Amino acid sequence: MMTIREYKKAESLEEAWQLNQKKQNRVLGGMIWLKMENINVGTAIDLSGLGLDTIEETEEGFAIGAMVTLRQLELHPGLAAYTDGAVRESVRHIVGVQLRNLATVGGSLYSRFGFSDVLTIFLAPVSYTHLRA
């Protein structure tokens, strides 16, 4: 069971980062993986208003936001074409569409669960993952 004492919708990445410096505070995304823990959260940090839910295609590659859902990854035509369907295949068998509509790339990478098919596709030699601690 998860208990949340306070909720804050971050207005900037800097604010979210500052809030997340306290050990008891947690970042919220799709909340799929947080439900697997028995935790007390001081402040729940909502990133939904920061525009991190987009996939941008550039000449160099793709910029994938932390709040992009697994379903967005699965259905993105540019990623499918660029990876010859590998991204789509890495997520399409994960539970069901309902879960993929909620689970986020950021949560899937940050949690580092051994069962994460998403983690594997981001380990490809030509991918770069930028994490800010």
How should each PLM-predicted stretch be described?
Residues 1-132:
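C-terminal structural segment of proteins
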